[in-house]
């Protein structure tokens, strides 16, 4: 589908932007995708999924090229081991990404949903309906499969997106985008320019200056990376700067369960932002729990750091410093602190947590409820691994990122987090003057049942 990309007015900073043509194309595409029928968007998603599988060999070969170059960067100290781990894309990860695309396909269309239908008066009907945000800029590090998740969510929500992956995953991102574009070309109704790949840091800098043309920036990566993005743009930013998660083992915890949850929350994928960095243990259960947990964690290769009370029980732990409590390791390193009460655990989380995901292990229902109610985080869990904090596991199909801000969206941002709403008012020549003054006509304000929008 060809598009008209004229823009009648531009922000002053955008006039000379090297990205201007690309962003104008994206905005034109967004106007089209905003009103695409669900059937067309779902056909585009299925075409994407099919093309990704058909291009698997080329995608994995490109990823292998990235991995070989990244291995040299790790040796030279230019890339962390955790970043290298996130970069790897094998057949199973690709299959999981494709499954995520198809799950998004099966989810209800979030666009055109009626959140409110209210008859203000006879013939004067107010509706609040969902609508795409417009043009997204998504910048991510290391994980090339994130590109697939983001593209799927953008297609389903009718948004355009400009994607920039880390330089260490350039070949992988190019191969993935080539496959996705090949799939979308099979759907003639789907506009060109809605999904675009950026490949340089200069383009990112230019993107961050396009206030008024780009509606939302979503960074995914290290805390320093996310902070850089937040500090260098006036475009709204959705994301989290840290993933500093805690698991608290209460005095009433099932010890075996607590050990299993500790292992899963830390070692299942230590580079993930929802892996725990600090283990808090109640003093009453510490003598029984810590020896078992330490043994199990060491068998998984975890480096352990403990506070003084912890080292009284396990003397050979590395002493934990003040910096450890505020460090996101994203690696097989875990700090352990013994606390005297639930209050102390909550206070520690309040001071050092990043409002991402926090969990308690306990059989005490009252303690669990206090933790769930009082801990301020996007996700608060009871007797469950912090690793469940994920859009796919929540049934959102995929996530574009995790937001730790107080205002919505919060937590894993899926389809609902990528739409806004607008008020639509239909009347029959109604005048405000008729509803003011001594003889003012009264409003009826009758709510109707919600209905779905585009089909």
Curated annotation (Swiss-Prot):
SUPFAM superfamilies: ALDH-like. It is an enzyme of class 1 (oxidoreductase). CDD domains: ALDH_F18-19_ProA-GPR (cd07079). Keywords: Amino-acid biosynthesis, Cytoplasm, NADP, Oxidoreductase, Proline biosynthesis. One of its GO terms (molecular function) is glutamate-5-semialdehyde dehydrogenase activity. One of its GO terms (cellular component) is cytoplasm. It comes from the Bacteria. Pathway: Amino-acid biosynthesis; L-proline biosynthesis; L-glutamate 5-semialdehyde from L-glutamate: step 2/2. It is found in: Cytoplasm. GO terms for biological process: L-proline biosynthetic process. Pfam families: Aldedh (PF00171). Its EC number is 1.2.1.41. The keyword Cytoplasm applies. Its main location: cytoplasm. Catalyzes the NADPH-dependent reduction of L-glutamate 5-phosphate into L-glutamate 5-semialdehyde and phosphate. The product spontaneously undergoes cyclization to form 1-pyrroline-5-carboxylate. HAMAP family: ProA (MF_00412). PANTHER family: DELTA-1-PYRROLINE-5-CARBOXYLATE SYNTHASE, GLUTAMATE SEMIALDEHYDE DEHYDROGENASE. This is Gamma-glutamyl phosphate reductase.
């Amino acid at each position: 589908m060809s598009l008209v990309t004229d823009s009648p007015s531009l922000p002053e900073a955008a006039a000379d932007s090297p990205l201007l043509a690309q962003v104008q194309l994206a905005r034109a595409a967004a106007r089209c995708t905003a009103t695409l029928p669900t059937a067309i968007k779902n056909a585009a998603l299925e075409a994407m999924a099919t093309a990704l599988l058909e291009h698997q060999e080329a995608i994995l070969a490109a990823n292998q090229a990235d991995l070989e170059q990244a291995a040299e960067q790790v040796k030279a100290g230019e890339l962390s081991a955790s970043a290298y781990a996130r970069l790897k894309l094998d057949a199973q990860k690709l299959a999981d990404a494709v499954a995520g695309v198809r799950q998004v396909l099966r989810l209800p269309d979030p666009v055109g949903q009626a959140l409110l239908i209210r008859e203000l008066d006879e013939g004067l009907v107010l509706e609040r309906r969902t609508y795409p945000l417009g043009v997204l800029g998504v910048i991510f590090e290391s994980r090339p499969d994130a590109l697939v998740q983001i593209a799927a969510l953008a297609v389903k929500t009718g948004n355009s997106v400009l994607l920039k992956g880390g330089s260490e995953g350039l070949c992988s991102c190019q191969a993935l985008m080539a496959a996705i574009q090949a799939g979308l070309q099979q759907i003639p109704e789907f506009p060109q320019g809605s999904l675009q790949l950026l490949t340089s840091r200069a383009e990112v800098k230019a993107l961050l200056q396009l206030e008024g043309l780009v509606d939302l920036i979503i960074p995914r990566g290290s805390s320093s990376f996310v902070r850089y993005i937040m500090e260098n743009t006036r475009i709204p930013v959705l994301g989290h700067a840290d993933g500093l998660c805690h698991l608290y083992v209460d005095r009433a915890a099932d010890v075996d369960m607590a050990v299993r949850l500790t292992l899963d929350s830390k070692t299942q994928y230590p580079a993930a932002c929802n892996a725990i960095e600090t283990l808090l243990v109640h003093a009453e259960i510490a003598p029984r729990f810590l020896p078992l947990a330490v043994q199990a964690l060491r068998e998984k290769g975890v480096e352990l750091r403990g506070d003084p009370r912890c080292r009284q029980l396990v003397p050979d732990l590395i002493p934990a410093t003040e910096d450890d409590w505020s460090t996101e390791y994203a690696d097989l390193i875990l700090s352990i602190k013994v606390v005297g009460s639930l209050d102390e655990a909550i206070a520690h989380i309040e001071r050092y947590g990043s409002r991402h995901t926090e969990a308690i292990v306990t059989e005490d229902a009252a303690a669990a409820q206090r933790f769930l109610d009082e801990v301020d985080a996007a996700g608060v869990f009871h007797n469950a691994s912090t690793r469940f904090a994920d859009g796919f596991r929540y049934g959102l199909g995929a996530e574009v990122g995790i937001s730790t801000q107080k205002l919505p969206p919060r937590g894993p941002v899926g389809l609902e987090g990528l739409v806004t709403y607008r008020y639509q008012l239909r009347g029959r020549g109604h005048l405000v003057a008729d509803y003011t003054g001594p003889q003012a006509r009264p409003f009826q304000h009758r709510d109707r049942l919600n209905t779905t929008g585009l089909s």
